[in-house]
Amino acid sequence: MTSLTLALDAMGGDHGPHVTVPAALRALQLHSFLQIILVGDKTEIDVYLRQADPQLLSRIEVIHTDEVVSMSDRPVHALRTRKNSSMRLAIELVRDARASACVSAGNTGALMAMAKVLLKTLPGIDRPALVSCLPAVTQKPVYLLDLGANVSCDSETLFQFAVMGSVLCEAVDKKSRPKVALLNVGVEEIKGNDQVQQAAQLLQHTEQINYTGFIEGDEIYSGNVDVIVCDGFVGNITLKTSEGIAKLLVHQLKRGLTQGLFVRFLAKLIAPRIQAVLSQMNPDHYNGASLLGLRGIVVKSHGNADETAYLQAISLAVTEAQRRLPEMIKDRLESILLDINN
């Protein structure tokens, strides 16, 4: 397979190289075609490379910088002053075609600002969107966007999100004509604000998008649709609420299975099945949010991701790079706009 290079912001997130470097080494073990550029403090990075397999080390490059974007940096401040930061240098590697994708667990606002300025948006895309997947009862992922990059959106922006989400589902899951819905306060056609109503009108007249109508919050995890579109304000609250409920359920399940001798005995008997269920509910299982609509690939990992979760974000970046996701979005949007204009 053709070689593929990823740029990792090794210093981003709560744990920095303690998580990013071991995850990078595991990614290299999984993908023999993969090359990785680690951007960050070389002294800190080298601590985790000392015992690594020499064959893996031959596929790693380290670019040194001791400047880091902190979680408290405002996006504009980071954009103006953190010009030698590990985050910015990693994105620049994508811009300069030295890497096919970038992964960072750093400051989301700063990552979005830098990516938009350095990589630019695709033709026909006004704003990038942050998208990730949620679990569903059908055992297939459901893509939700936007997750907070754009607090308020007009109808045209929501329409663009629907196009990008549909293409992402096709590219990553290889699903033909994924079902797309708008998140709303009701399923009736008269429900919703002006932006959602107008976005629905646009999607209803777009044959290339398999638009199924409105969906309410209680149906998000049903698996009845593949892509759910909303503005970033609603999307971020939905995501954080989902993660909180998942943690609550895991906590309650674990506590319930430790109360009483007979219950503990049964829990041991079905431990593998319990572990499988808990894994499906764990937000880390779905780690990795894509910044869609850019001319390059950028994947955002949770800031508190552990090694396994960060590896998931790397794997997502690999898949998107292999599918050439930005080009797919660009081509599909051009085709849709051509149909609309004709």
UniProtKB/Swiss-Prot annotation:
Catalysis performed (reactions): a fatty acyl-[ACP] + phosphate = an acyl phosphate + holo-[ACP]
Biological-process GO terms, alphabetical: fatty acid biosynthetic process; phospholipid biosynthetic process
The EC number(s) this enzyme carries: 2.3.1.274
Cellular component, GO annotation: cytoplasm
One of the Pfam families matching this protein, by short name: FA_synthesis
Disulfide-linked positions: none
Pathway assigned in UniProt: Lipid metabolism; phospholipid metabolism
Key words of the record: Cytoplasm, Lipid biosynthesis, Lipid metabolism, Phospholipid biosynthesis, Phospholipid metabolism, Transferase
Keyword Iron: no
GO molecular function, one term: phosphate:acyl-[acyl carrier protein] acyltransferase activity
Subcellular location as annotated: Cytoplasm
Record-linked InterPro entries: FA_synthesis (IPR003664), Phospholipid_synth_PlsX-like (IPR012281)
Its job: Catalyzes the reversible formation of acyl-phosphate (acyl-PO(4)) from acyl-[acyl-carrier-protein] (acyl-ACP). This enzyme utilizes acyl-ACP as fatty acyl donor, but not acyl-CoA.
Self-association and partners: Homodimer. Probably interacts with PlsY.
Family, as annotated: Belongs to the PlsX family.
NCBIfam families registered for this protein in UniProt: plsX
Protein name: Phosphate acyltransferase
Organism: Shewanella sp. (strain W3-18-1)
